[in-house]
Amino acid sequence: MAQITVVGGINIDIEGSPFEKLKYHDSNPGRIHLAFGGVGRNIAENAARLGGDVAMVSVIGDDQMGQAARKELEGLGVDVSCVRTLRGRNSAMYLSILDDRRDMELAFCDMDIIEAITPVFLKEHREFIAGSRIIALDGNLTEELLCCAVEMFNGTPIFFDPVSGAKALKAKSCLGGFESIKPNILEAEILTGITIDGEDDVRRAADRLLEKGVKRVFITLNKDGVYYTDGGSEGFLRPVDSLKIVSATGAGDSFSAAILMGTVWGKTVEETARMGMAAASIAMESSCAVNREMNIQELLRRLT
């Protein structure tokens, strides 16, 4: 058993970018980059790099890339005993084609395999998961699975990452079962029905989530930082002006990992939010979804 168990997706991300202007209906010389991704997987990797005792619950196909993704997590110290290989299936994949300015022209996603993480699958690992200090749920999971997890593990704190506005909708019926949640502004609007135009609206949306039963709320505000509250302590944290941003791609997943670590360490909601901001600042200094330089020493240094 691990202190932190992440239930979610493991993806293979493939990105192609041309050396020159993209030519349609033709073969374009360029670079093809392959990386392991998935919200759940990225959260697990970040938490492991921060020194967390982490387990991953997921599914992969019986292809080489899926097995390599599993092996990489294992090499980081993540318990992958609950990552199941499905025979005859492809691992989840995301293929993006960029133009010469590195803007996305086209993308394909083949992620149906995540639907194999079913309530039955969860029940098979019930004892293992229930022994965690906190469980993280990836918003890519099905609505049935989210609600089942809330009911099945009601004695264990659950963290939910909505992932996107459309996917946040799946959690509306079981919001009260989450100990903590990290929506962005759009996701908070969808979950609460409150239009957010300023700080007062952010507070109102967070209060609505607390009313629904969530214990700790972290609403991320893009370049403006984060708002945190647990009903007793609340506040806004802003990014430092000296922040060096290479890419914001991995900021959200690293923030989520820091919330998990803060929970395990018994940190206050403010301390946890500060950990999230520090982790996000590290993540944004890399072009990768997970910064290889993510570590607990650097996070603690940025908290001082």
Description of each model-found segment:
Residues M1-V78, K244:
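Glycine-rich phosphate/adenosyl-contacting loop at the front of the ribokinase-like
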Residues A47, N184, G252:
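Short, conserved phosphate/pyrophosphate- and ester-handling motifs at nucleotide-, phospho-/glycolipid
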Residues T85-L86, S96-I134:
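Conserved phosphate-binding/catalytic loop of the ribokinase/pfkB sugar-kinase fold
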Residues E45-D53, L98, G262-G266:
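Alpha-helix C-terminal capping segments
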Residues M93-I97, G225-Y228:
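Short beta-strand scaffold segments in enzyme catalytic cores
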Residues G75-G88:
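A glycine-rich helix N-cap at a beta->alpha junction
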Residues I134-R204, D224-V226:
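Conserved beta-alpha-beta core of the PfkB/ribokinase-like small-molecule kinase fold
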Residues M1-T5, K167-A168, K172, E199-T304:
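Conserved phosphate-binding/catalytic region of the ribokinase-like
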